[in-house]
């Protein structure tokens, strides 16, 4: 197989361009590509969907390891290129916005693997979109900005811990696998990237409605520099005294800050909030 650097140069000489508006940075490092594919494909019979295939350098390798790959690409010009370059491989190319993709439309009630070098300008919306479809996924292996990767796997008490950390960890067990330097791409981004692998699962002992849970979490982080009592009062539109009673019932000090609470503590607060509102 033609190596990634030569493949990319050949296609770029043919007139293909990276569109900044779509956050396109093309991966050219074979070692990184192989590492992502190896982390993604544990069972060749499990279907794979790739988000943002770009020029297809990773898609080619995924298609050698998996029996079926769906590549989701918004850029119509890249779709035509992919159809030409990937001819003969077990790849279906979907010209659509990944934020509108329902995985059940691809593999029904089964589970598959999601892989992607996610466009940095819509990383969080994409992650949230697919985490909400956790029942359709066995795992995800995604490349994101290093700072986003750190947030995804952050633990309570650190500056990186926030809504995205909690959303990811409620739905999956995540691990940052390795970092990827800017020179692995063309054009080179201004930031270091990182690859994160998620094993999708239900959070052990999760006992509240996710809608209620995330309403409380978002309210708690709505004024990050303030105490939990003040943030929840403002975010939920409830009197400060009532919030104090709610937090006392949950066993949580109202002087703490949102970034110090574990998922289990947020569950306790959610339960207390909902009982108070009934």
From Swiss-Prot:
It catalyses: adenosine(1518)/adenosine(1519) in 16S rRNA + 4 S-adenosyl-L-methionine = N(6)-dimethyladenosine(1518)/N(6)-dimethyladenosine(1519) in 16S rRNA + 4 S-adenosyl-L-homocysteine + 4 H(+). SUPFAM superfamilies: S-adenosyl-L-methionine-dependent methyltransferases. S-adenosyl-L-methionine binds at residues 25, 27, 52, 73, 97, 117. InterPro entries: KsgA/Erm, rRNA_Ade_diMease-like_C, rRNA_Ade_Mease_Trfase_CS, rRNA_Ade_methylase_Trfase_N, rRNA_adenine_dimethylase, SAM-dependent_MTases_sf. It is an enzyme of class 2 (transferase). Keywords: Cytoplasm, Methyltransferase, RNA-binding, rRNA processing, S-adenosyl-L-methionine, Transferase. GO terms for cellular component: cytosol. It is found in: Cytoplasm. It comes from the Bacteria. Its EC number is 2.1.1.182. GO terms for molecular function: 16S rRNA (adenine(1518)-N(6)/adenine(1519)-N(6))-dimethyltransferase activity; RNA binding. Pfam families: RrnaAD. Its main location: cytoplasm. Belongs to the class I-like SAM-binding methyltransferase superfamily. rRNA adenine N(6)-methyltransferase family. RsmA subfamily. Specifically dimethylates two adjacent adenosines (A1518 and A1519) in the loop of a conserved hairpin near the 3'-end of 16S rRNA in the 30S particle. May play a critical role in biogenesis of 30S subunits. This is Ribosomal RNA small subunit methyltransferase A. It comes from Desulfitobacterium hafniense (strain Y51).
């Amino acid at each position: 197989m033609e190596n990634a650097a030569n493949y990319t140069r050949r296609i770029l000489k043919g007139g293909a361009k990276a569109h900044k508006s779509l956050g396109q940075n093309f991966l050219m490092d074979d070692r990184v590509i192989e590492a992502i594919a190896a982390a993604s494909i544990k069972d060749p019979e499990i279907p794979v969907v790739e988000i943002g295939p770009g020029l297809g350098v990773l898609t080619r390798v995924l298609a050698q390891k998996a029996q079926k790959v769906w590549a989701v690409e918004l850029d119509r010009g890249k779709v035509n290129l992919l159809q030409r370059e990937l001819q003969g491989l077990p790849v279906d190319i979907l010209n659509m916005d990944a934020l509108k993709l329902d995985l059940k439309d691809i593999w029904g009630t089964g589970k598959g693997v999601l892989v992607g070098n996610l466009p940095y300008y819509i990383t969080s919306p994409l992650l949230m979109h697919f985490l909400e479809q956790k029942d359709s996924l066995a795992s995800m292996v995604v490349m994101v900005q290093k700072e986003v990767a750190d947030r995804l796997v952050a633990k309570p008490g650190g500056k990186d811990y926030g809504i995205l950390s909690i959303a990811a960890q409620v739905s999956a067990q995540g691990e940052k696998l390795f970092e990827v330097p800017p020179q692995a791409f063309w054009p080179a981004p201004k930031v270091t990237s990182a690859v994160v692998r998620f094993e999708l699962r239900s959070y052990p002992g999760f006992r509240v409605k996710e809608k209620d849970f995330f309403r409380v979490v978002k309210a708690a982080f709505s004024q990050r520099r303030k105490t939990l009592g003040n943030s929840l009062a403002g975010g939920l539109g409830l009197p400060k005294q009532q919030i104090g009673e709610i937090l006392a019932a949950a066993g949580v000090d109202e002087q703490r800050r949102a970034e110090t609470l574990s998922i289990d503590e947020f569950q306790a607060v959610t339960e207390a909030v909902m009982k108070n509102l009934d």
